[in-house]
């Protein structure tokens, strides 16, 4: 499954300026996803993070990964009228700054479901270089 921005807007409840996934390159719904966030200088967070040395906040990289994971879950045909709520992160690591002009590659792999909580192993990369990673826990809820 691939998605453009128009498809993503229909899947996720987020909107500008907090929609942080631009395109889905590939997705095996419920199992794995590879998506893109194009990081541009026009992002509002660059106004104050940091003037003269813009860096994408790590928490927003994690949020991008959480949104990609939500698309992975919500892409299943058996899931309708639901929303995915981010519950927690484990083992978050930030390895390299993400700056304007970077294409952030978001990869998320389903690792399990326990008591209604989805577990995803996530990695964000620029090119072939890993810039961040975390384990994300999320829960599916009615809209």
Swiss-Prot record:
Please list the coiled coil stretches: none
Q: Name one Pfam family in it.
A: FabA
Mind telling me which CDD domains this protein's record contains?
FabZ
Q: Where in the cell is it found?
A: Cytoplasm
Catalytic machinery residues: 49
Reactions listed under catalytic activity: a (3R)-hydroxyacyl-[ACP] = a (2E)-enoyl-[ACP] + H2O
What GO cellular component entries does it have?
cytoplasm; membrane
Q: Which domain of life is it from?
A: Bacteria
The answer to whether keyword Cytoplasm applies is: yes
Q: Which Gene3D superfamilies match?
A: Hotdog Thioesterase
Q: Quote one Gene Ontology molecular function term.
A: (3R)-hydroxyacyl-[acyl-carrier-protein] dehydratase activity
Keyword set for this entry? Answer: Cytoplasm, Lipid A biosynthesis, Lipid biosynthesis, Lipid metabolism, Lyase
From the UniProt record, give one GO term of the biological process aspect: fatty acid biosynthetic process
Has UniProt tagged this entry with the keyword ATP-binding? no
E.C. no: 4.2.1.59
Purpose: Involved in unsaturated fatty acids biosynthesis. Catalyzes the dehydration of short chain beta-hydroxyacyl-ACPs and long chain saturated and unsaturated beta-hydroxyacyl-ACPs.
Q: Tell me the HAMAP family matching this sequence.
A: FabZ (MF_00406)
Q: Which NCBIfam families match?
A: fabZ, PRK00006.1
What family is this protein classified in? Belongs to the thioester dehydratase family. FabZ subfamily.
The name under which this protein is listed is 3-hydroxyacyl-[acyl-carrier-protein] dehydratase FabZ
Its source organism is: Wolbachia pipientis subsp. Culex pipiens (strain wPip)
What does the organism's lineage look like at the top?
Bacteria, Pseudomonadati, Pseudomonadota, Alphaproteobacteria, Rickettsiales
User: What's the encoding gene here?
Assistant: fabZ
């Amino acid at each position: 499954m691939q998605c453009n921005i128009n498809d993503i807007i229909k899947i996720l409840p987020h909107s500008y300026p907090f929609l942080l996934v631009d395109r889905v390159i590939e997705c095996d719904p419920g199992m794995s996803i590879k998506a893109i966030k194009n990081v541009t200088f026009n992002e509002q967070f660059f106004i104050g993070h940091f003037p003269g040395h813009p860096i994408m906040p790590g928490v927003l990289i994690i949020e991008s990964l959480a949104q990609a994971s939500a698309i992975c879950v919500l892409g299943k045909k058996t899931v309708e009228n639901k929303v995915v709520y981010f519950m927690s992160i484990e083992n978050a690591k930030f390895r390299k700054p993400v700056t304007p002009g970077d294409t952030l590659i978001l990869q998320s792999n389903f690792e399990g479901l326990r008591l209604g909580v989805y577990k995803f192993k996530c990695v964000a990369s620029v090119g072939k270089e890993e810039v961040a990673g975390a384990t994300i826990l999320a829960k599916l809820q009615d809209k």
